[in-house]
Amino acid sequence: MRYITAGESHGEALIAVIEGLPSNLLIDEEFINKELKRRQGGYGRGGRMAIEEDKVHVLSGIRNGKTIGSPLTLEIINKDYENWKNKKTPEVTRPRPGHADLAGAIKYNQRDLRNILERSSARETAARVAVGSVAKLLLKELDIYVKSKVLEIGGVKAEEKWRRTIDEAKSKGDTLGGIIEIVIEGVPVGLGSHVQWDRKLDALLAYHVMSVQAIKAVEIGLGFEAARKPGSLVHDEIYYDEERGFYRKTNNAGGIEGGISNGSPIVIKAAMKPIPTLLKPLTSIDINTKEEVKAAYERSDVTAVEAAACVLEAVCAWVIADECLKKFGGDSIEELKKNYDAYLVYVKNF
């Protein structure tokens, strides 16, 4: 499978086109809309979330609620577009440290930074959540589920202190990042491969996780902690039971060994940096005058860690769904499930 997204933050709509879905997959629009609503939630979000009410509209690829094998096109209307379509906006010439503004302007020869920030905005992730929701619907057919939880916000692990931490940052005109854990349950042994670097499952997951705006680090299993311990305390010993088959009592590998899923839950941690748009802007340089200035301010969140958790679920669901289709094949959901069930029997009898 593959997908692309299109659209700008304050454009008329966001679009996603998914190619390669099997036919007869039920597209539950209510579920997709619930996922989109999750992305809009979380304490510390900005004023944009009071404007938008993200809903998916399927433009192509289904009949009677099910996929038909052709490209699936999803649309999400930007309600804020109505506030911008006739508005003459001044050029943005003061790049924000930590954002794509300056590097993007130089790369694409743009003197108005809005031409960069409109697409680089995390608003694009609404389209990816819609795509990931479709992937989740496919995985549900195989009893595979993706979930997440926020572990830290602004370096604070205690959930009951997060609101106060966010409020303090807001009062200072600052922003906060955090750490998110994603767990994928029900993944069979055998997704990914050791035979080529670009087929390794952990590499694919890390690539997609790092593609999400503001994500700066990723760990799988013990991650960096594995580098601090001897091998005897890191590697998961292997056991066998007639009912369970091969299994491990620990999961330091995070469900992946040698680039291949090993049947344990896949565990990923991702670090999100603070949002680059600060109410009290940092020092920058005006690209036209070359004078020292304060960076531009765009309406933004104090933190979006909880929203990012939903986005990370989506991109991880996409990777696992795509790998399932690569391994088990099937032009229809029925064929995919038949192949998958046969594989599970093979694994049980290995």
UniProtKB/Swiss-Prot annotation:
Which keywords accompany this UniProt record? Answer: Amino-acid biosynthesis, Aromatic amino acid biosynthesis, FAD, Flavoprotein, FMN, Lyase, NADP
Q: What is this enzyme's class at the first EC digit?
A: lyase
Which InterPro entries does the entry link to?
Chorismate_synth, Chorismate_synth_AroC_sf, Chorismate_synthase_CS
For this protein, the record's Pfam families field holds: Chorismate_synt (PF01264)
Query: So, what pathway does this thing act in?
Result: Metabolic intermediate biosynthesis; chorismate biosynthesis; chorismate from D-erythrose 4-phosphate and phosphoenolpyruvate: step 7/7
Q: Which cofactor does it need?
A: FMNH2
The enzyme's E.C. designation: 4.2.3.5
What is an example of a GO molecular function annotated in this UniProt entry?
chorismate synthase activity
The UniProt annotation places NADP(+) binding at R39, R45
Catalysed reaction per UniProt? 5-O-(1-carboxyvinyl)-3-phosphoshikimate = chorismate + phosphate
Biological process annotations from GO: amino acid biosynthetic process; aromatic amino acid family biosynthetic process; chorismate biosynthetic process
Q: Which domain of life is it from?
A: Bacteria
Cofactor binding mode, per the note?
Answer: Reduced FMN (FMNH(2)).
Q: Does the keyword NADP apply?
A: yes
- State the GO CC annotations: cytosol
**Which residues are noted in the entry as FMN-binding?**
R119, S120, S121, Q213, A214, G258, K273, P274, I275, P276, T277, R299
PANTHER family in UniProt: CHORISMATE SYNTHASE
Concerning its family, UniProt says:
Belongs to the chorismate synthase family.
The protein's role, per its UniProt record: This reaction introduces a second double bond into the aromatic ring system.
Q: How does it assemble?
A: Homotetramer.
Name of this protein = Chorismate synthase
**Organism of origin:** Thermoanaerobacter pseudethanolicus (strain ATCC 33223 / 39E) (Clostridium thermohydrosulfuricum)
